[in-house]
Amino acid sequence: RIPESKFFGVQYDPSNAVVAGDDPIELLDAVLGRVVSMHASDRYLVPGATLEDLRQAEGSAGYSKLLLHGVTGRGLNNYPAIFERLSRAGYCGWISIEDGMNGMQEMRESLLYLGQMVDRYYPA
């Protein structure tokens, strides 16, 4: 539980929720009024793996060999739902791209995708 104080906020990272075996949308709904910044990245399951396999792997999700890092918007995170909730809540803080594990081209693709999300949910 987050202490009720203006000095405690949340750095929302949907991929960390996936890594922990949690639902990123449920987490966001629980902390939405406290989000002060967000990391944007995405995780993928290796071919043939399921979320249940991830939850059972090595006793916990963690940084399992069943997860890969890749282009934001193409993995397990539901970014339209995330941006819809953030926009509806009036969030206007930082969105930091946490990417580049597989080279600059993937970083560019992530940036393009996130720009589209911002344009869609935060029209000028």
Where do the model's predicted regions map?
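Histidine-acidic metal/acid-base catalytic patches
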Residues: 1-124
